[in-house]
From Swiss-Prot:
CDD domains in the cross-refs: PIN_YqxD-like
Species of provenance: Proteus mirabilis (strain HI4320)
Pfam families for this protein: DUF188
Protein name per the record: UPF0178 protein PMI1258
Family membership noted in the UniProt record: Belongs to the UPF0178 family.
Length: 151
């Protein structure tokens, strides 16, 4: 099963974890972005550059992702769409979204959008911590192990 990465906003440190995992586990990872990406040479790493525009990369990932594929994204609506298709969604902080948690996340996101639209400063997410990186690597390893067991 392939891994799809919403690469425009994916932190560099997470991409580096993915580069190593691709070669170690021999799994194909495709980085989808609306800009040119520079990735290490590997038979398992691919880039897919889409045209610039709102949600173009997200729509491409939704179109290509299949059941049990892994999608790496911090984009809540994208995660919701791929979960509907049966794919697995994991954010760069190591949170694996489920059908039940994604609804809650969508509600929080919509609430925060409403607050920002009314002029309230909500701030952004905290920077990625070492714990976040470890959680991400652990969840990635869990998914990779599940894929090995299916073979």
């Amino acid at each position: 099963m392939p891994i799809w990465v919403d690469a425009d906003a994916c932190p560099k440190v997470i991409k580096e974890i993915l580069y190593r995992a691709a070669d170690r586990e021999k799994v194909v990872i495709t980085f989808v972005a609306n800009q040119r990406l520079s990735i290490p040479a590997s038979p398992y790493l691919r880039t897919l550059q889409v045209s610039a525009g709102f949600d173009v990369a997200d729509n491409e990932i939704v179109q290509r992702a299949n059941q049990d594929d892994l999608v790496i994204t911090a984009d809540i609506p994208l995660a919701a769409e791929v979960i509907e298709k049966g794919a697995i969604a994991l954010n760069p902080r190591g949170e694996r979204y489920t059908e039940s948690t994604i609804r809650e996340r969508l509600n929080i996101r919509d609430f925060m959008d409403t607050m920002r639209a009314s002029g309230i400063q909500t701030g952004g997410p905290a920077s990625l911590s070492q714990r976040d990186r470890q959680l991400f690597a652990n969840e990635l390893d869990k998914w990779l192990l599940q894929q090995k067991r299916k073979k």
